[in-house]
């Protein structure tokens, strides 16, 4: 671990033997290494001496025991302590009274954490799963490769460098430490990077390899439980989850304000959750038809019908995580703002959003759509990070909550009600929706479990909602081709290309290359702005594909395959934006045609 709490040499581990007498478990003295663990403390048993053994020096690791606030232990004399771990009772005999007292102080400190703010609001199983998830490098990579997320944070910090120059900075939930590095690059004098998962050890490794040990101090622990040696000028963090509040990391971010100096800065400074009614018959029927599986009365001779109602309720309790065309929204979004500088963490235990939507078009309201924006209000500039469906897609996507009973609404009507986000101990929220169509008796409500969303995003371009075309798409397409053909009209004279002026075009004589437009090296099915389609001049015709070297895949196909391999949880590998596309004709004379640069 990156934070070693204690290393105690010359210890003996005794257990009860077959004859009910204490015997040395390993037959020799050992070193007890105590280190940080998200759930308490890790006790590693090492061979005495040697140079290996899992970091920090010491001998070979013989065993490791997790010790937490629920672990049974008791004092045994001045130099011994009894711990029940690994399914057996261990008698730890230390080399000195001082070592024994140090070990007991660590246990006492750990036991005091059982009543920390975080532990009181979080189930043990949820916390364990949460910290394990964020302890994986692959998950950190997923977030870091979200270009919009990472680059917006970088710009917000760089463009407000005077807020960081020679300042003390706290990075809450530092993860890999990327924001801490940005702060140092902006001139921070000192950064305390606090990370509760085992990712802290990797963050420390990055700090060391980048020669920033004097600038960045990695602290392994929860912000609710650790102590800082000084107050800070700025707090930075990336605490947002789905629908802004999921994972309840925002409460941890706000808790960190106990270390913030008066008039200190917070990056981000505020968060806006947007809520809008939407119509999407296809999505509704998709969930509805899943539940209809249980309508079968003869499934391998078994009648499933009695479970259909329970299945329907379960499917409609799932928030949908994907993206959509904003034109499916039936009214202007309602904005709920949380000012991180003034809000208290208790304000996020129950969030009520009163809504009143003035319907802009007639149709069926199938539920409510959610997205968020956050602001970085610095001294020099204000930068916004948006997850709106009109903006480039991020790993937060957007979230939609369906009504099991949709509401038919007409243009000009008012749809009112409330949305309540009730925090639970699973680090998430129960989303309660209650809507009424004003002037009628029509109502609809639903309760959804934000901890159990349905990840629906497939990478395919988002289609426009039905009925969006106001002119004939067919005529528009052929008209565009006709106009392009008129501009590029050519004639063939004895097999030689001649332009519209009657002059021989020498540019493609003795060339087997097929002229085609530059193609940016990004597949339209990846994270792109909502509803954008691949342009006509970027398509590869079947005849072009047939003439290409079969050993070299054409870009329209190969980019897609590479994308599928490099798309990790919603983030795109940077190589997709840097590797040039090549179209090669089946001829030894052919030269590659490079795709256009993507900006």
Curated annotation (Swiss-Prot):
Keyword Transcription regulation: yes
Entry annotated with the keyword Transmembrane: no
E.C. no: 2.1.1.319
GO molecular function annotations of the record: histone H3R17 methyltransferase activity; histone H3R2 methyltransferase activity; histone H3R26 methyltransferase activity; protein-arginine omega-N asymmetric methyltransferase activity; protein-arginine omega-N monomethyltransferase activity
Keyword list, A-Z: Chromatin regulator, Cytoplasm, Methylation, Methyltransferase, Nucleus, S-adenosyl-L-methionine, Transcription, Transcription regulation, Transferase
Catalytic activity annotation: L-arginyl-[protein] + 2 S-adenosyl-L-methionine = N(omega),N(omega)-dimethyl-L-arginyl-[protein] + 2 S-adenosyl-L-homocysteine + 2 H(+)
GO BP annotations, alphabetical order: chromatin remodeling; peptidyl-arginine methylation, to asymmetrical-dimethyl arginine; regulation of DNA-templated transcription
The SAM-dependent MTase PRMT-type domain, residue ranges: 127-434
PTM annotation (Asymmetric dimethylarginine): residues: 487
UniProt subcellular location: Cytoplasm; Nucleus
Enzyme class per UniProt: transferase
Family from the record: Belongs to the class I-like SAM-binding methyltransferase superfamily. Protein arginine N-methyltransferase family.
Quaternary state and interactors: Homodimer.
Entry function: Methylates (mono- and asymmetric dimethylation) the guanidino nitrogens of arginyl residues in proteins. May methylate histone H3 at 'Arg-17' and activate transcription via chromatin remodeling.
Protein name in the entry: Histone-arginine methyltransferase CARMER
Species the sequence originates in: Culex quinquefasciatus (Southern house mosquito)
Lineage: Eukaryota, Metazoa, Ecdysozoa, Arthropoda, Hexapoda
Gene giving rise to this polypeptide: Art4
């Amino acid at each position: 671990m990156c934070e070693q709490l204690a290393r105690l040499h010359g210890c003996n581990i005794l257990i009860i033997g077959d004859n009910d007498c204490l015997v040395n478990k390993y037959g020799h003295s050992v070193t007890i290494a105590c280190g940080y663990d998200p759930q308490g403390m890790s006790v590693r048993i090492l061979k005495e001496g040697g140079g290996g053994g899992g970091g920090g020096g010491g001998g070979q690791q013989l065993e490791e025991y997790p010790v937490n606030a629920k672990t049974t232990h008791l004092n045994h004399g001045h130099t011994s302590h009894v711990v029940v771990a690994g399914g057996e009772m261990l008698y730890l005999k230390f080399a000195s009274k001082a070592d024994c007292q140090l070990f007991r102080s660590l246990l006492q400190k750990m036991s005091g954490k059982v009543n920390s703010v975080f532990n009181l609001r979080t189930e043990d199983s949820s916390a364990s799963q949460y910290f394990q998830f964020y302890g994986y490098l692959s998950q950190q990579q997923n977030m870091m490769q979200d270009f919009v997320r990472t680059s917006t944070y970088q710009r917000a910090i760089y463009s407000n460098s005077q807020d960081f120059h020679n300042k003390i900075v706290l990075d809450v939930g530092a993860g890999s430490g990327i924001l801490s590095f940005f702060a140092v690059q902006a001139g921070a004098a000192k950064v305390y990077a606090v990370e509760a998962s085992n990712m802290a050890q990797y963050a420390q490794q990055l700090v060391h390899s980048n020669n920033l040990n004097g600038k960045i101090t990695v602290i392994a622990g929860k912000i609710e439980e650790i102590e800082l040696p000084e107050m800070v000028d700025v707090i930075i963090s990336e605490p947002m989850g789905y629908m802004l509040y999921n994972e309840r990391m925002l409460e941890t971010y706000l808790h960190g304000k106990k270390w913030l100096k008066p008039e200190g800065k917070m990056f981000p400074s505020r968060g806006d959750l947007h809520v809008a009614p939407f119509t999407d018959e296809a999505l509704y029927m998709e969930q509805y038809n899943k539940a209809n599986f249980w309508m079968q009365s003869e499934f391998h001779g078994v009648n499933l019908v009695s479970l259909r109602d329970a299945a329907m309720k379960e499917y409609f309790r799932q928030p949908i995580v994907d993206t959509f065309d904003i034109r499916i929204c039936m009214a202007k979004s309602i904005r709920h703002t949380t000012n991180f500088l003034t809000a208290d963490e208790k304000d996020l235990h129950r969030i009520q959003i009163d809504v009143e939507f003035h319907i802009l078009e007639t149709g069926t309201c199938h539920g409510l759509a959610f997205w968020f924006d956050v602001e970085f209000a610095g001294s020099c500039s204000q930068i916004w990070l948006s997850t709106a469906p009109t903006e480039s897609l991020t790993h937060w996507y957007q979230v939609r909550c369906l009504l099991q009973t949709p509401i038919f609404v007409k243009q000009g009507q008012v749809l009112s009600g409330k949305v309540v986000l009730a925090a639970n101990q699973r680090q998430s929220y129960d989303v309660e929706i209650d809507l009424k169509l004003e002037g009628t008796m029509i109502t609809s409500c639903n309760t959804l479990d934000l901890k159990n969303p349905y990840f629906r995003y497939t990478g395919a371009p988002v289609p426009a909602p039905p009925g969006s075309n106001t002119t004939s798409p067919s005529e528009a397409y052929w008209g565009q081709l006709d106009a392009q053909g008129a501009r590029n009209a050519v004639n063939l004279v004895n097999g030689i290309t001649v332009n519209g002026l009657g002059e021989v075009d020498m540019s493609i004589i003795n060339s087997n290359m097929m002229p085609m437009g530059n193609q940016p090296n990004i597949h339209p099915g990846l994270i792109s702005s909502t509803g954008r389609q691949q342009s006509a001049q970027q398509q590869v015709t079947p005849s072009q594909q047939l003439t290409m070297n079969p050993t070299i895949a054409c870009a329209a196909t190969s980019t897609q395959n590479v994308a599928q391999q490099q798309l990790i949880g919603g983030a795109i590998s940077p190589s997709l934006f840097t590797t040039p596309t090549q179209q090669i004709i089946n001829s030894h004379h052919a030269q590659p045609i490079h795709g256009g640069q993507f900006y």
